[in-house]
Amino acid sequence: MVENIGSGSAELVSYAKLNLYLDVLGKRSDGYHEIVGLFQTISLHDTLTVEICDRGFYLESSVALPSDNTIKRAWEMFRKNTGKEFGLKVTLKKEIPVGSGLGGGSSNAAAVLRYLGEVFKIPLEDLLNIAAQVGSDVPFFLYGGTALVRGRGEIVEKLEDIEGYSVDLFFPGIHSSTKEMYLSLTPEMYRKGPGRVEELHRAYLERNYEKIKELSYNVFEKVFLEKHPEVMDGLRNFGDGSIVKMMTGSGSVFFALYPLDKGNYSFVGGV
């Protein structure tokens, strides 16, 4: 979502995502892991104010970010792939916790790419190629809503958006390293999920709560809880009466799924 706010600036909304399903199928020859997942954006979001300038990159953030952050990489990869020369000023108001599995960094990058694509008239197909160079989850965020995601995250099949659900989130205050979590997986852990992602999507559309509970899966959840058993104490009092309670991404946030608007954050549709 882009809103012009005057003086050449624009305000961008950058939504968080949940993994309603996430499994690892194996390790690829390029070092990445092959995944399959059902991704969904939710109303929790960061806000970015962006302004194109003559040269340089300037970022003011409400939380500390590394110098090689995804927003800067998005700007660099966009310039490299399009040949456009310009600078960028960004002010980031963070609401999505860092290291939570909610995809905040990837979402920020996608929001910037989408904005630059509109400004410079770059087709979505080209933006998707740039997004894959920035990060594995970035292509999904160019679509948002509900999608089947495969490959290392760059293969995105837009699905009918799921509506009428909400979630509460439990953040245990632990920064979960995606790289460390992938390194913790062993071949015996691959392909352990039900694998019926399209069926899970259909269960959401049909409001088949028992089937949702049966087919929901995250390969990283068991690994994360083995590393951080203290999190179980907080989870015991979280998500009473929910349809399903599970972790998103490689951690550390857990979500409790509810029908309609019982939860604090609603499902958000895509483009």
UniProtKB/Swiss-Prot annotation:
InterPro entries, per the entry: GHMP_kinase_C_sf, GHMP_kinase_N_dom, IspE, Ribosomal_Su5_D2-typ_SF, Ribsml_uS5_D2-typ_fold_subgr
Family as reported in the entry's similarity comment: Belongs to the GHMP kinase family. IspE subfamily.
Protein name, UniProt field: 4-diphosphocytidyl-2-C-methyl-D-erythritol kinase
Record-listed E.C. numbers: 2.7.1.148
Catalytic activity: 4-CDP-2-C-methyl-D-erythritol + ATP = 4-CDP-2-C-methyl-D-erythritol 2-phosphate + ADP + H(+)
Binding site for ATP: 97-107
Function, in words: Catalyzes the phosphorylation of the position 2 hydroxy group of 4-diphosphocytidyl-2C-methyl-D-erythritol.
Positions annotated as active site in the UniProt record: 17, 137
Gene responsible for this protein: ispE
Gene3D superfamilies: 3.30.230.10, GHMP kinase, C-terminal domain
Enzyme class, spelled out: transferase
Biological process according to GO: isopentenyl diphosphate biosynthetic process, methylerythritol 4-phosphate pathway; terpenoid biosynthetic process
Pathway membership: Isoprenoid biosynthesis; isopentenyl diphosphate biosynthesis via DXP pathway; isopentenyl diphosphate from 1-deoxy-D-xylulose 5-phosphate: step 3/6
